[in-house]
Regions:
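Structural and coupling elements of P-loop NTPases
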Residues: 11, 21-414
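N-terminal chloroplast transit peptides
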Residues: 1-13
Length: 414
């Protein structure tokens, strides 16, 4: 579903542009019609590899942290504010990131949630570090774009959207900071449609904004999710589910707000197109979620809905064919190299997106650029700054090769 070659942009002469804007993979291996074993195919289908992108200060890293909280990867969410007593975030672990409260380098975070294995890449929002974000967008199958509800589409948002569009990366939108004074939600989705050129498909709808923001209405389930705030949003928000006509909902909202919400929900059914997963994956429609990452409102709703719709690993275009992720030939490409991830050891990590097949520790691969055979002895799975030796990985996964590997960004390994 959604893996047609029509979603792939044409390759350009520049290898750097190819890395940013296409699914180009210069494989020269012999064609293989063999596929991975059934158990490995199931593992590949479980993968959801995506990036979170935004204009600076839209709440991207906060949303990342809350997805980890609801995904069970952490028990207590950190904060990106400068208060010393608050816990630091899992994704912003570098000294500069902790000091400035911003992301300056992309971070890989893998965790399991229900039936999915999630590979989440938190990216820098500030334009000074945007090159790192562009490289990451060559390694993902979808992207979550975070919008500030008080500001709407901002310059860096539009710039990153264009990169995703050229690469055929499906976009999911999270309109954040509904707990603050916000622009009218109908105005926001109208702007998104006009500026981005994609059909909006609101998955949920906000119940008020600012201090009056109480939760969201799940349009698919026809349920209202009412939340209670927790200190600093460090824990999961207590949730109460009810029908929109339930007396609990009427009591939680003012008469005026309740009437506004019911009218807007009815209007949406008449003016927006039904959510169509095929159109989402084809880059024609964008699911839209409302919430507050800081207070955990709407985060779980977004996470579960997103994982249902987001694509599993998609193929990449080689010089002669589409590379199927389920082929038994291992292939991958280098999309990022970062030095001094561990200052005590002055190491160098080479980030590889696995495109097809299975990675096994100590396997030998060929660097297609140099023709050299290389043994991958020290591969690691990363969770922010934490590392774990990796014995096996599958198409869709991101691995870090640590050591003196003589690879360059854009290298293909087979």
């Amino acid at each position: 579903m959604g893996q047609s070659t029509g979603r792939v942009a044409n390759c350009t002469a520049s290898s750097y542009q190819s890395l940013l804007f296409t699914r180009f993979l210069p494989l020269t291996t012999s064609a293989s019609t063999n596929t991975v074993p059934a158990a490995a195919a199931r593992e590949i289908r479980r993968r959801r590899t995506f990036a979170i992108i935004s204009h600076p200060d839209a709440g991207k890293t906060t949303l990342t942290e809350k997805l980890l909280l609801y995904g069970g990867a952490i028990g207590l969410a950190g904060s990106v504010t400068s208060k010393k007593e608050q816990q630091s975030t899992s994704s912003d672990w570098m000294g500069m990131e902790k000091e400035r409260g911003i992301s300056v380098s992309s971070t890989v975070l893998q965790f399991d949630y229900k039936d999915c294995c999630v590979n989440l890449l938190d990216t820098p929002g500030h334009h000074d570090f945007s090159e790192d974000t562009y490289r990451v967008l060559s390694a993902v199958d979808s992207a979550v774009m975070v919008i500030d509800a008080g500001k709407g589409v901002e310059p860096q948002t539009l710039k990153l959207f264009e990169v995703c569009r050229r690469r055929g990366v499906p976009i999911f939108v999270f309109i954040n900071k509904m707990d603050r004074p916000s622009r009218p939600p109908l105005e926001l989705i109208d702007e998104l449609e006009k500026v981005l050129g994609l059909a909006p498909a609101p998955v949920n709808w906000p119940l008020g904004d600012g201090p009056r923001f109480r939760g969201v209405y799940d349009r698919k389930k026809g349920e209202v999710n009412l939340y209670e705030r927790t200190p600093h949003g460090a824990f999961k928000a207590p949730l109460e589910v009810a029908g929109i006509e339930d007396e609990k909902v009427r009591e939680a909202l003012s008469d005026e707000l309740y009437e506004t919400v019911t009218q807007e929900v009815e209007l949406l059914d008449g003016v927006t197109e039904p959510l169509d997963i095929e159109r989402v994956l084809a880059g024609e429609q964008m699911p839209i979620y409302f919430g507050s990452a800081m207070n955990n409102f709407g985060v779980q709703n977004m996470l579960e809905s997103f994982l249902e719709m987001a694509p599993s690993p998609t193929g990449r275009v080689s010089e002669s064919k589409m590379v199927d992720p389920n082929t038994d030939n291992f292939s991958g490409f280098v999309f990022k190299i970062q030095a001094n991830m561990n200052p005590r050891h002055r190491d160098r990590a080479v980030f590889v997106r696995i495109v097809s097949g299975i990675f096994e520790r100590d396997m030998q691969v060929v660097d297609q650029r140099s023709g050299r055979k290389v043994r991958l002895a020290n591969a690691q799975k990363l969770f922010g700054q934490d590392r774990e030796t990796l014995d096996t990985a599958y198409a869709g996964d991101i691995l870090a090769l640590v050591g003196n590997y003589n690879f360059l960004i854009g290298d293909t390994l087979t």
